[in-house]
Swiss-Prot record:
It comes from Acinetobacter baylyi (strain ATCC 33305 / BD413 / ADP1). Keywords: ATP-binding, Cell cycle, Cell division, Cell shape, Cell wall biogenesis/degradation, Cytoplasm, Ligase, Nucleotide-binding, Peptidoglycan synthesis. Cell wall formation. One of its GO terms (biological process) is peptidoglycan biosynthetic process. The keyword ATP-binding applies. The keyword Cytoplasm applies. The gene is murC. InterPro entries: Mur-like_cat_sf (IPR036565), Mur_ligase_C (IPR004101), Mur_ligase_C_dom_sf (IPR036615), Mur_ligase_cen (IPR013221), Mur_ligase_N (IPR000713), MurCDEF_pg_biosynth (IPR050061), UDP-N-AcMur_Ala_ligase_MurC (IPR005758). One of its GO terms (cellular component) is cytoplasm. This is UDP-N-acetylmuramate--L-alanine ligase. It is found in: Cytoplasm.
Length: 482
């Protein structure tokens, strides 16, 4: 008998036993950040996987290289001997593939429900919170990997260390982001959970009620078994408010003295942050995280809390943090190009909520104190722009120069008073910065950039839409005309 490989062991270990009747899994919108990772993991487990997307992309090309058939465009003819259809909340119920599946009695499940099935028979670790999920999930995954625990992981961004956002590991561990945007994280049944923070976002899901949002986070913690573990940010007021209702073993982390896991003696130098972590019954541990910003120290503390509980050594934690190469579009340095007697440094970041944008601005100021900060910001969703309008005005006024793109709709219809022109007017009236409206479609971006940028600027492209592609083009000097 030939010896089994780690891949063979992983397939036997993680394949869901109760899904034995399922052979062919089809993903509608397979190129989405939350979909492609699950699709790839299922393919690696031995299922037949196919799917469709509205357009070709690097992600769909990657999936096809892995042997996953991807159709461009949605049509009922794509469904060939499919056993289950996986959709995200972004998919219209009138989608022809969804309608065909319903007509043919093919089960239609949400992506989080499928992720929940992957987690059901494993030691699942779910990372929830309004901000910081992707980086925290990536840090924890890296710590487990450094201890040779070989976890399966599903992340909302590309882990720079591996170049992918999901992988099938040979161990019982699975680490995944838990998405509160549509309350679908309630499908998960993890053994350990992290809550990084709780803020008002995706309020349409919760009927505009912040209390309902907080109630749902409590319900998420109740998905843990009574012997599970919740690791939550004790510095976050909203998390502290709901903690008494958890009813599960809980550890808090943060900078404040009343936390179980604390960071002290913080020193920030360039693109690195140094701190000492204090934990109960442990010696103080001096660490360096290869990321700037206090928010990334908090992300590291969350990962340390779970990693320590799972048996990861201090040495592995230290190696993981110091060697952490980041996540795609999370304060990602895209490069530099020469300008005059200096250069312009390009950084790209996915943050799209006012608190995320503010954390990125602080990290940029701390890591590059001698550079002028020029931000190219693309608001994401009209509803978020409406709900967080005043906060956006305040935060975006903190940069030295602001280039403002139109709102990326993400499938939403325009909302009166929630567009970039109105946002620019309010920022201008505040008087701290003079915003410049930019429309890349009109082809005026190169000329505007030429006029705005100065030697030794830091240009930060910010947002969850397609603004990141501009940073890539700039790094390749396709948009900057000398």
């Amino acid at each position: 008998m030939s010896p089994t490989t780690p891949a063979d062991q992983a397939k036997k270990l993680i394949k869901v036993p109760e899904m034995r009747r399922i052979k062919h899994i089809y993903f509608v919108g397979i190129g989405g950040a939350g979909m492609c990772g699950i699709a790839e993991v299922l393919k690696n487990q031995g299922y037949k996987v196919s799917g469709s997307d509205i357009k070709a992309s690097k992600t769909t090309a990657h999936l096809e290289q892995k042997g996953i058939k991807v159709y461009i465009g949605h049509t009922a003819d794509n469904l060939k001997a499919v056993d289950v259809l996986v959709v995200s909340t972004a998919i219209d119920p009138e989608n022809p593939e969804v309608k065909a599946a319903i007509e043919n009695r093919i089960p239609v499940v949400r992506r989080a429900e499928m992720l929940g099935e992957l987690m059901r028979y494993r030691h699942g670790i779910a990372v929830a919170g309004t901000h910081g999920k992707t980086t925290t999930t990536s840090l924890l995954t890296t710590m487990l990997a450094e201890e040779n625990m070989d976890p399966t992981y599903v992340i909302g961004g590309l882990l720079n260390r591996t170049g992918v956002n999901a992988a099938l590991g040979a161990s019982r561990f699975i680490v995944a982001e838990a998405d509160e945007s549509d309350a679908s994280f309630l499908y998960l049944q993890p053994m350990a959970a992290i809550i990084t923070n709780v803020d008002a976002d995706h309020m349409d899901t919760y009927g505009g009620s912040f209390d309902k949002l907080k109630d749902t986070f409590v319900e998420f913690i109740h998905r843990l078994p009574f012997y599970g573990l919740a690791v939550v940010c004790g510095d976050d007021h909203n998390v502290r408010e709901i903690m008494p209702r958890f009813g599960r073993p809980t550890l808090t982390y943060g900078f404040n003295e009343d936390n179980d896991i604390r960071a002290v003696d913080v020193v920030q130098e360039g693109m690195q942050s140094h701190f000492t972590v204090l934990r109960k019954d442990r010696e103080p541990l001096r660490l360096t995280v290869n990321q700037p910003g206090l928010h990334n120290i908090l992300n590291a503390l969350a990962a340390i809390g779970v990693a320590t509980d799972e048996g990861v050594s201090d040495a592995a934690i230290a190696r993981a943090l110091e060697g952490f190469s980041g996540v795609g579009r999370r304060f990602q340095v895209q490069g530099e190009f020469e300008l005059g007697e200096g250069s312009v440094k390009l950084v790209d970041d996915y943050g799209h909520h006012p608190k995320e944008v503010e954390a990125t601005i602080k990290a940029a100021r701390q890591s590059h104190p001698d550079r002028r900060l020029v931000m190219m910001f693309q608001p994401h969703r009209f509803s978020r722009t409406r709900d967080c309008f005043d906060d956006f005005v305040e935060v975006l006024s903190q940069v030295d120069q602001l280039l403002l793109l139109e709102v990326y709709p993400a499938g939403e219809k325009p909302i009166v008073g929630a567009d970039s022109r109105t946002l620019a007017r309010s920022i201008r009236l505040r008087g701290d910065v003079e915003p410049i409206l930019v429309d890349p479609v009109e082809g005026n971006l190169p000329n505007i950039i030429q006029k705005v940028l100065q030697p030794n600027d830091l240009l930060l492209t910010q947002g969850a839409g397609n603004v990141g592609a501009i940073s890539v083009d700039l790094a390749q000097q396709q948009l900057y005309l000398k």
